[in-house]
Amino acid sequence: MVMMKSFIVKGKFKAGNSWEKFTKKIESQNEKNATDKTYSIFGSKHGVKRSQIQIESVAEE
């Protein structure tokens, strides 16, 4: 069984003409997967492409 860690991902995404800041708590195996999961969530929920998301930090909680 793989241990899942909690990561806090901070950044901003393009919402119309402005950038909106976000902070997300992501359960993931490692930092790279947490980053990919964040891109996936924003693409799914907000219809935002990866190029319109800027991740500023990923920290293990």
From Swiss-Prot:
Gene3D superfamilies: 3.10.20.10. Belongs to the eukaryotic ribosomal protein eL20 family. It comes from the Archaea. This is Large ribosomal subunit protein eL20. The lineage of its organism: Archaea, Methanobacteriati, Methanobacteriota, Stenosarchaea group, Methanomicrobia. It comes from Methanosarcina mazei (strain ATCC BAA-159 / DSM 3647 / Goe1 / Go1 / JCM 11833 / OCM 88). Part of the 50S ribosomal subunit. Binds 23S rRNA. GO terms for molecular function: large ribosomal subunit rRNA binding; structural constituent of ribosome. One of its GO terms (biological process) is translation. Keywords: Ribonucleoprotein, Ribosomal protein, RNA-binding, rRNA-binding. The gene is rpl18a. The keyword Repressor does not apply. One of its GO terms (cellular component) is ribosome.
